[in-house]
């Protein structure tokens, strides 16, 4: 069975879609074992808890340095040993150490063409509004 760690920052609609797809057997032989949120107020945490999924909250601003945050996130993922890390609306940059340490095991769900519509402010409906505005 494929072990998934899903990283989130907000409402968790992508997380819910993954959970539903697993429960409906659209995604087979996979299980979300861990949800990590970069925000204490992310509704995604509640979605995970409703399905009995372990959650961790690792808020970048609660660390004295970027290096300390990077280390905490890396250690959390290393302990979980996921087969796949899914960035599902995760609004924090992924540290190079994680990219190197989990090479070939990270996918990003992003709702638009990168790099044209990414970065600060490009989340949720805002991505689509910007794309439509540009034409």
Feature roles, as predicted:
Residues 1-135:
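One-carbon transfer enzymes
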């Amino acid at each position: 069975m494929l072990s998934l760690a899903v990283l989130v920052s907000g409402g968790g609609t992508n997380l819910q879609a993954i959970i539903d797809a697993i429960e409906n057997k659209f995604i087979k032989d996979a299980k979300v074992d861990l949800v990590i949120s970069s925000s204490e107020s992310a509704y995604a945490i509640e979605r995970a808890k409703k399905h009995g999924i372990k959650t961790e909250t690792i808020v970048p601003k609660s660390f004295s340095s970027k290096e300390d945050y990077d280390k905490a996130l890396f250690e959390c993922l290393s302990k979980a040993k996921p087969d796949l890390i899914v960035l599902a609306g995760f609004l924090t940059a992924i540290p190079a150490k994680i990219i190197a340490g989990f090479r070939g095991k990270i996918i990003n769900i992003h709702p638009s063409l990168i790099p044209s519509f990414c970065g600060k402010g490009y989340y949720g409906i805002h991505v689509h509004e910007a794309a439509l505005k540009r034409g």
